[in-house]
Curated annotation (Swiss-Prot):
Quaternary structure and interacting proteins, as annotated: Heterodimer of LeuC and LeuD.
Keyword presence, Metal-binding: yes
The name this protein goes by in its record: 3-isopropylmalate dehydratase large subunit
Species annotation: Solibacter usitatus (strain Ellin6076)
GO biological process: L-leucine biosynthetic process
Keyword Disulfide bond applies: no
Amino acid sequence: MPRTIIEKLWDSHVVHERPGAPTLLFIDLHLVHEVTSPQAFQGLRERGLKVRRPDLTIATADHSIPTTDRSLPIVDEIAAKQLAQLETNCKDFGIRCLGVHSSQQGIVHVIGPELGLTQPGMTVVCGDSHTATHGAFGALAFGIGTSEVEQVLASQCLLQRKSKTFQVKVDGALKAGVSAKDIILALIARIGIGGGTGSVFEYTGSAIRALSVEERMTVCNMSIEGGARAGLIAPDDATFEYLAGRPHAPKGAAWDAAIPRWKQLPTDDGATYDRSVSIDADTLEPMITYGTNPGMGVSINAALPDPSQVSDPMARDSITKALAYMGLEGGKPLVGHPIDVVFIGSCTNSRISDLRTAAGLLKGRKVSPKVRVMVVPGSQEVKRQAIAEGLPEIFRAAGCDYREPGCSMCIAMNGDQLAPGEYSVSTSNRNFEGRQGKGGRTFLASPLTAAASAITGVVTDVRTLL
């Protein structure tokens, strides 16, 4: 019987199943960070348990790590305690830790792929919502809670209920100024933040195949914002080329054996999905969010929804409240709205290709004196590559604050945050109330839109600067 890649990945990792109960799955890679792991490690201590497979577990410091000078003491006591505890826990349980001063430190969803830890056919979990990023390699990757982190540490297995299959087919070609971030923002605006509930997305189509592997990571990263458990893309030659030679990728005969196996993963001809949706890439425009969840998105020049024209009372109330929090008026476009901060970074858009894109637009230009611009590479490796290409000099010459790797303003628990009432154009993935700082107001967009808005000081259609 023909199967989707989602079904193949599930079937190949079943340890035990019985009717009406969750299935026990084997986990190939467990990624750990400092925020959701302390209670899990403490649970192991209290129960006298060891980590079952430390060789399949790796930790990094990312959420609460400062993006300022690493030679200085960490001022935030909670952050300092979390980061120190991570290193202690990893030492006690024999887990490799890419800590504050590691040359491989970075955002967990950046370092996994760049080190070659993430590979096709794997199950990957992490105590973080955006673990779906790793699905760009043809892996079944999803976020888990702290109690589940403890379960995986103790057993290398996890109880899960099987998700439905959801095909997101994107055909056509993206126009200049339109990017992978716009694909996923357009999808979420269309289906809503609950549209994928109970499902795993498989992204297919010519527009997806045309994306680089790093762009595919951006798309998969925000699957959770569309309500999905995970999102993935079948591996192809681009995937294999990306992985070849990376530190933890197979080598020699193991590599030669892996390729034919990985080529069996794509969805079979004739396989069916529980649900499908199609997007025409030819018609997509730069996207931006206006409200307080990622589903509140519009094309850059479109008018914002007018609550008085919305018939559904719940939707009308939600839009009314969002516009009030954001200080916006329905029926008018966002283009031209003043901003205070631009953030280029996060596990969605902090890879070297993202920095290249932003630097390409900023080169020879200056950012608005009214705007504070933060550029935060996703890892030490991205930082090194950016230096080799001269990107920090471009950002600094333009007037940007170029910082050390970490989650930074995406989550505002590390000193990088908005002041109450400030507006940001952000390349991150969530725009909830207070997400980037108490009272802060976030517009989610692509690196191109963010860089363009940094130059003008207002929300800007990047196509006017190309």
